[in-house]
């Protein structure tokens, strides 16, 4: 079982997120990470960074089994934008932290936003989805062991098969990014 170092755990506990209104405009208010007290018309911002190789395969990662939510599921890199952090800067940071890849200046960029609403749960969020094309192989990937239990370069059909098994996070919301 992998353990996060104390510094990383403290950093996560101290993380702050901007609060947005239903039109994705900042309210000027900030919340603590995972402090699910958002009203039904308030949101925080998350990002996903999909990495595609020129051969059409996508870099997907497998969540560690110690995750409280969706352990062992496949996903693409992503996470919450921190307070004061622009969406693009957040996706650059998340991809770098989780995979070791620098997508700044890579072909591609922002594709679309979707909204996830969980009435009464205090956890509503926008997801900005990005896709970047990079000519990479195994030697380029340096994944974050505290969060990721492995990775693969998958075809669209392989990703769809994981989704059909019910083990690919957010597939229905992001499937058009794999086209």
Residue ranges with predicted function:
Residues 59-60, 76-109:
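The catalytic Nudix box helix
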Residues 23, 53-56, 64, 133-138, ...:
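Short loop segments at secondary-structure junctions
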Residues 13-48, 54:
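Acidic, metal-coordinating catalytic segment for phosphate/diphosphate chemistry
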Residues 35-38, 67-70, 151:
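A short local loop/turn or secondary-structure capping micro-motif enriched for an aromatic residue
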Residues 12, 71-72, 83, 110-117, ...:
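Nudix hydrolase/Nudix homology domain
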Residues 1-6:
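Short, small-residue-biased leader/transition segments that mark boundaries at the very start
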Residues 46-78:
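A glycine-rich, hydrophobic loop/mini-helix early in the fold
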């Amino acid at each position: 079982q992998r353990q996060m170092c104390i510094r990383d755990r403290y950093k996560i506990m101290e993380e702050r997120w901007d609060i947005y209104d239903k039109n994705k405009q900042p309210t000027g208010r900030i919340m603590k990470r995972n402090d699910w007290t958002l009203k039904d018309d308030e949101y925080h911002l998350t990002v996903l960074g999909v990495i595609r190789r020129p051969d059409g395969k996508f870099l997907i990662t497998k969540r560690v089994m110690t995750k409280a939510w969706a352990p062992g599921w496949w996903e693409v890199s992503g996470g919450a934008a921190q307070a004061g952090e622009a969406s693009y800067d957040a996706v650059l940071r998340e991809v770098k932290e989780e995979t070791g890849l620098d997508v700044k200046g890579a072909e591609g960029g922002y594709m679309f936003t979707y909204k996830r609403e969980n009435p009464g749960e205090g956890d509503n969020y926008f997801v900005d989805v990005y896709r970047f094309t990079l000519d990479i192989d195994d030697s380029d990937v340096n994944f974050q062991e505290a969060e990721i239990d492995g990775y693969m370069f998958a075809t669209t059909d392989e990703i769809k098969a994981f989704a059909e098994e019910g083990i690919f996070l957010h597939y229905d919301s992001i499937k058009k990014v794999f086209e």
